[in-house]
Amino acid sequence: MANIQHDLLMLRGARDMRPVLMSVVGDPYDMGRKDNDKPSGLMKYVGSNDHSDSHTRCVLMLLRSYDHPFLILTKGGMLAAKDFDLYGPNDAFGVTLTFDNDADSLHWEPGAALPADRIASLKEAHRRNIRTWVSMEPVICPEQTMHLIEMTYDFVDCFWIGKLNHFPELEAKIDWPKFRREVEALLQKCGKQPGTGMG
């Protein structure tokens, strides 16, 4: 936390208000972590006396105390809603959506919240006037990606879409140029731009 505080002071001094992204390489609401609902020793940095504050909440409180914007990306679903009170007008809540059904999600994303739970968290964030975004990376089943956009565009501000990599056999089965044309047409029909508007 001291390092984060130091970095925030440096960013403030440089007038660098680019949002902090939490996270593409991990998950701030990883459902398998034991400390997501446990007392955090980091509370002293944010002046919290609430022993239920998680590591993630403490970091968000610190960011908020410096009025520094943040972007959340999670597969944790409604677990993240407990921190929605910390969001300001320059912050955004995002989830990764890869599949539209539980069976595929359980196979490819073990330990993650199921798609309906993640979608519920987006709806709740939108209801609270929090900007929302979805990362659709990697696209494994283009039909499901298209269906997810159709299911969520009313309460999602921005979609980031990325192609599948490192699975040559699966990649070869997908007509990527065709998918790109179709997904761009769908986003345009829904009044959305791919990968813009979140920072």
Which role fits each region the language model picked out?
Residues L187-G199:
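C-terminal accessory regions of radical SAM enzymes
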Residues A2-C190:
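Conserved AdoMet/S-adenosylmethionine-binding subsite of the radical SAM
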